[in-house]
Amino acid sequence: MLGLQSKQNPIQNPHTISTAHMGPLRKLRRVIENCCTSGGPATMSPIGVRLSVQDRYVTIDNGILQLTLSKPDGIVTGVQYNGVDNLMEVLNKEDNRGYWDLVWSEPGSNGIFDVIKGTDFRIIAEDDNRVEVSFTRMWDPSLKGTLVPLNIDKRFIVLRGSSGFYTYAIYEHLEGWPDFDIAETRVAFKLRKDKFQYMALADNRQRIMPMPDDRLPGRGQQLAYPEAVLLTNPINPELRDEVDDKYQYSIENKDNKVHGWVSFDPPIGFWQITPSNEFRTGGPVKQNLTSHVGPTTLAIFFSAHYSGADLVPKFRGGEYWKKVFGPVFMYLNSSWIFTDPQLLWEDAKIQMQIEVDSWPYNFPLSEDYPTIEQRGSVTGRLLIRDRHADDDYIYADSAYVGLALPGDTGSWQRECKGYQFWTRADAFGNFTISNVRTGDYNLYAWVPGFIGDYKFDATISITSGCFIDLGDIVYAPPRDGPTLWEIGIPDRSAAEFYVPDPNPNYVNRLYINHPDKFRQYGLWERYAELYPDGDLVYTVGESDYTKDWFFAQVTRKSDDQTSYIPTTWQIRFKLDTVYQNGSYKLRIAIASATYSELQVRFNNLNINPPHFSTGLIGRDNSIARHGIHGLYRLYSIDVKSVWLVEGENTIFLTQSRSTSPFQGIMYDYLRLEGPSGSDANERI
């Protein structure tokens, strides 16, 4: 059953900056407070936290903000702050303002969208320093087919002196309950469109946004799919002829820590802060939505975006499952003298770092949320052994190292039921993974600059308070022989390849002269415009992959423009000698695939079956959704010497599936290795 606990713990308020480890942040916050405030310091709010419970509403007030929740639904119906009676969209129905939701289905059925409404309300804690309330919805067999078979406990917390509120939830599927899939769960906030029109996701991803009305017929024209709209007659004429698409604002988990909206009159910021990734799925580079036109801000805990069904949790055979999502923090700030939304953004980043450094929090009272004392840590040093790159061990500089549920090597990127804990190694390969929940894990890693995945060969059992030192561990990346040639950088992204400018009729001006130009709409159409008479040909030793290798192998339209046809790329290279003893090896690392099949042929385009085929792979949809990667795949192809010739050789790469413009492959890296032990040590 869901655990409810009322034990009072001493509260460490993240809004009180510790001088022990927050010195620089404290100084910067003081500077910003000259013109920007998070509601003022706690001394400006001498009253404690007050809870008021009525028949249909629950109100929590700490003198800085007032949070109103429907009862027993647990929907955020109002947030009063800085003289504004409600920051939520008052034009929306009350159950369409601030809510937890999910998309679920019975096996083989279509997804059902469910705004989670509680049926029972409980006070978990109530004193001057903290109020925590609970809204639960319990499942029983009479609800089969109508509600997702989960017990759900939604929590909301307001602390004294805190300019914001926290929310988290516990989902539980009891043993023997029905099978189901859950494609997505999140917290969504719909803000007032007459106030919040400036959105910020990163230092270089901020802009005035369209109004939701601009996406409707008469003001906007739908493009290739409903999410993408060309603004033909927007309310703000400066946005005319821009493309709006929520997927242009996706962020990788590792960078998805703070985003939100700014109101100009009065100057207020509403920010969604996620202090930890432990409850998200898919690892550090899984991409998710953030904020978009609405104005909407999201805290997404898991989704199938940029991955497909591989990241949809599927519960079968009556398995037991419980997971805590959050807490996440909704932070409010304001400016005394408004000059630039950048001030509120900078303050929000400071608060984000404070929340991150305060994790795990000590104030949530669910027994399912472990304190820092109940968690453990793992440390070690990761080294790389690649005799063809260096005779000595190589430090795993900036490696991604993480703990996830036990599984096969690389399984972490598809794991979607448990918790994951990730860190980056330093320049010498040293890593520490702190504040890990108790349980059994495998340790996984991957290293930018090297192909493949690492998995430590033993299960790691985390107990309360443990500190496990693994010492030196060694990753030997896939390697059979010396590198003859390579294309790209093995970093699980296609960002290093050629990304074209968009059609000038379909631009998002935020991404003009921006490092993320791959987020522009319609780049898949640019391939055929750049290669009108034939497909891409890459010549090793002459071509430059930053200019001559298109970032995605997409389809092209047929001559009569009524259908799509496959594309075949060529890699041309010379071999002075073909060694007959031993096989060559072609490594193809794929950064993303969408309903694709890669067929590989050597020096014979017409041979069937091909020398190698991946079969049908991928549902990432990264091409349509402006990603530069999806799920990582690595293929190691044995290349028989009889397939090669002395002199000119050609590898044909055919993406053979072609019913849509969005089918295709993004390559991460390609490498041809000579036979092991041969004299083929000269790079081409």
Predicted feature locations:
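Acidic-aromatic substrate-binding/catalytic surfaces of carbohydrate-active enzymes
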Residues: 55-121, 127-141, 146-148
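A contiguous, surface-exposed recognition patch within enzymatic or periplasmic domains that forms
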Residues: 190-323
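A short, amphipathic beta-strand motif
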Residues: 376-388, 429, 473
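Short, ordered, surface-exposed loop/turn motifs in non-cytosolic proteins
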Residues: 377-378, 387-416
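Short, acidic Ser/Thr/Gly-rich low-complexity loop/linker segments typical of extracellular
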Residues: 409-430
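Beta-strand-rich ligand-recognition modules
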Residues: 425-428, 564-581, 589-683
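A short, solvent-exposed beta-strand micro-motif common in secreted/extracellular proteins
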Residues: 429, 439-450
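Structured interaction patches on ligand/partner-binding surfaces of diverse proteins
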Residues: 448-472, 476-478
